[in-house]
A protein has these predicted regions:
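Compact soluble domain cores
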Residues: 1-58
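Short, compact, well-ordered microdomains
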Residues: 51-89
């Protein structure tokens, strides 16, 4: 799995160590299928995507702002994950 930060996330991580720690914790939660602040329907869609393929989405309210973690399966069967501010979506 490749993980990418948007410019906004990258800039905030570079200047804010607390936020950087929150991002690491969010990634750990995501890897453990803790989808954060999603409704039950979106969480169920993630569970189906794990079994049958598709996009995964998580949302976490951090100290600076809400962030999304989104994973897509590419045509090369490689998981690509992007972390972005909700405002960047």
């Amino acid at each position: 799995m490749r993980i990418y930060f948007t410019r906004g996330i990258n800039d905030e991580v570079a200047k804010n160590t607390q936020f950087a720690k929150e991002i690491v914790e969010s990634i750990k939660r995501y890897c453990n299928h803790d989808w954060g602040d999603l409704c039950a329907e979106d969480k169920e869609m993630n569970e189906k995507a794990l079994k049958h393929g598709g996009r995964l989405l998580a949302a976490y309210k951090l100290s600076v702002a809400k962030v999304y973690i989104i994973t897509d399966d590419t045509k090369a069967n490689e998981w690509v994950t992007t972390i972005l501010f909700a405002s960047e979506y």
